[in-house]
């Protein structure tokens, strides 16, 4: 199995991936709080982890992927009160919205999507264990985690308790043993959902939810935990304290991976700053593949600045890849035979495949991996031009292997799935026959030197997304997918 290195936020260095269970990769990614439609800052981690999961499967790992929904939260409660509907109505509405846009972006469904609201018993049990072990204490129906009890607190974020207290922006609660102690259970308040517990009616705190759900489905030690870099502190720091305090297992997570922010004019995009763009709105102007490619065009740990110009660039890049796919599908139909050029193309394809895998195996560097993909696309297009400029034959065995390699690349990145289908819809035969009639009429115009009419046919087809390519072997049409 190919060696993979990952950048571990905990150790602040790259490490060779060594799974808890050989041959398996267990990953937990913090999901959305469903109180609004997802914006592209929300989308980045899920597209990133979709690619990580795809590549881990390609390498040969059995992947278990868990992603939660934080469907009990202050923001959901505030939205429900503002609209005069129940909190679960709000949560369900925006969970549906999440799935709609992620499906459009080609994000494959996680194996498990636990919700906080259906795991209250697990959360209560974990809190009780923390109390029993001396890590937590109850105050007037609230339960707090005592950060001073956990010796590793601050290791993920690289902060000491003194640093945290000095820079804290939290309400001072004189009842707590330490200002940094955080809520595991919140006593019920009027107008909020609540559940029964040993400490009275209430609801979970934010951090305990992920600890309880990750351990339930992945065990007390698992491989990957991911999320945005804004979650390092306090959320993931607190998760570690809870999970390891409860189980005694250190570390509870072997590798912590965090993606960078999406920025607008170098400022972090977020709902709280009101400078965000909803995925559903962007998809009204750009294809899902264009947005997905944009999100993967920079290494996941680096910031990514959003602009219409970047999305236009993504569209143009995908058109180049789509052309290479169409050319490969055309070459598959050419006359079979031996050809040294095809073998040379295959040798280059294998070299690009190795480069692609090297990049993905080095902390999932999609920016570098896609450069290999474009390198191969260029070689495919050059070869296609050589074949169509003469009456040539094609080594079909070589082309089939080049196709496998190129499709592997686009499958891992998760783009242009429909392009590989070619024109295979329900009316494909009729569509092809109609296009051949149009092309024959255009060719007759060219032969009779009616250039303006021939150009008019070409231009009108272009307006509806159909491109005509002329070669010595005749005209070929293709429909733009992006």
Predicted regions and their residues:
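N-terminal, positively charged nucleic-acid-binding surface of large information/translation enzymes
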Residues: 11-14, 20-106, 473-477
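Alpha-helical recognition segments enriched in aromatics with Gly/Pro capping
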Residues: 1-35, 46, 50, 64, ...
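Structural preference for alpha-helix termini/caps and helix-kink/transition segments
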Residues: 268, 276-482
